[in-house]
Amino acid sequence: MSWLTQRPQTSDPTNYYTVGLNKTTLLVGLGNPGKEYAGTRHNVGFLCLDEFVAKTDAMGDWMQKKDLKCLLSSGQIGDSRVIAIKPMTFMNLSGEAVQAVISFYKIDPTRLAVIHDELDIDFGQIRLRVGGSSAGHNGIKSVTIAIGEGYGRIRIGVGPKKPVRIKAEDFVLQKFSEAEQQQLSNLTREVNAILSEYLYGAQFPHDTRNFLV
C-alpha cells in the first residue's frame, strides 16, 4: 500500500532540497551497476530500494546524477524530505556517492539508512542497528570511511543454511536460489515496513526481523 497518492510533479530533485531544510533523510541501497549483477545476493540493497521507490507514490522516478555518481529518487514522506540513491561506483567505492550526496544536499550523516547484504546472517533474517563493524563488507567499509559509522544499517542476511564449498566473494555474486527467490517479495515488504517506521519515527530501530513464511 502506498503512503501518498501522487508523485512529485517536478523532474528536478534539487527543487526539494535547499539549504535550511531541517529534516532530510537519505536512503542508500548498495549494489554493483550492470545487468550482470542484477538479481545477485550482493545487489539486494538495490532490489529493496527499487521496490521502495516503486511502491511509494511520494517518491519520484529514478534520475541519473553523474556528478553525484548515483541514481537518485526524491520525495516527501510525513515531515521528512527523502532522498534515495543507488551508487553507480561499484560496491567498494560506494562511499564516494554517499559523501557527494550528503555534501551537496547538506544532509546530517546520522539521518542515513543503508540497505545491504550480510553473509554472516542467515537468509531470512534482517538485523537493524546503528554503527558497528563492516564485517568484511567493502561497501559498508567505504561508506564508513567517507562519513563515519553513526548511520543506520539494514543488514539483510544472505548466508546459506549449510556450509558451501565456494569463496564468499563468489557466493554473494551468485543469483538467489529458486527457493530464496520465492521469499524476496516478503523481504522487500518487510524492508518497506522498516523504512516506514524509520521515516515516521524518531529513531532508527534496533532489532531483528524474520521474513520467511
Question: Over which residues does each language-model region extend?
Answer:
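Nucleotide and nucleotide-moiety/phosphate-recognizing core
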Residues: 2-131, 141, 145-152, 162-167, ...
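Active-site-adjacent mobile loop/cap segments within catalytic or ligand-binding domains
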Residues: 170-184
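Short loop/turn motifs enriched for small/polar and acidic residues
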Residues: 157-161
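Conserved glycosyltransferase catalytic-site signature
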Residues: 137
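Conserved TIR/SEFIR loop-to-helix hotspot centered on a Trp-containing motif
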Residues: 134
